[in-house]
Design a protein with these regions (language model features):
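Membrane-interface alpha-helices at helix entry/exit sites of multi-pass transporters
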Residues: 48-50
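A feature for the membrane-embedded catalytic helix bundles of lipid/isoprenoid biosynthetic enzymes
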Residues: 52, 56-156
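Membrane-embedded alpha-helical segments that form the functional core of polytopic membrane enzymes
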Residues: 1-46, 74-79, 124-135
């Protein structure tokens, strides 16, 4: 993912294609690494924590690469970063309240990065960022509603 962020940031002639392919490949390995850890019995709280932190760092780096590469308006990129982090925070805070939000919302991290990779590859990065803003915003609201509903049910 960091390699795709670098490619996007350099603004290379085929940067959207190369960056998108790198993003798809890194997404595949990100998906597989957790499954391998579970299958081999090598999961740990530290590994889970570091995986989540590096996922967020990589996601922000990708958006910053798009910003530096000039692929989308700065305000859209910043909004995408803010909403993406808020979606993750909403889940983390709900988890701390013993409310599970995995799978809640139409725009989890994998979906957001898939939009960036695929729509970016075909040459429409700014619309891809707009789609990310919309689905991240919807996901944030969905998670807030589900969390509020669960809190209300627990206190009744």
């Amino acid at each position: 993912a960091l390699a795709s962020a670098l490619v996007y940031g350099l603004g290379l002639e085929f940067g959207l294609i190369i960056g998108g392919i790198l993003l798809l490949v890194s997404g595949f390995f990100d998906m597989v690494d957790g499954q391998v850890a579970r299958a081999t019995g090598k999961t740990s709280q530290n590994g889970s924590y570091l995986d989540s932190m590096f996922d967020k760092i990589a996601e922000v780096a990708i958006f910053l690469g798009l910003l530096v590469g000039g692929y989308a308006e700065p305000y859209l990129v910043m909004l995408a970063i803010a909403l993406s982090l808020l979606v993750s925070y909403a889940r983390a805070k709900s988890d701390a309240l013993n409310i599970k939000l995995q799978g809640v919302g139409i725009g989890e991290r994998a979906e957001r990065l898939l939009v960036i990779a695929i729509i970016g590859i075909i040459g429409y990065m700014e619309p891809a960022v707009i789609i990310v803003v919309v689905i991240a915003g919807i996901t944030l609201v969905q998670r807030m509603i589900v969390t509020a509903k669960n809190i209300k049910e627990k206190t009744e």
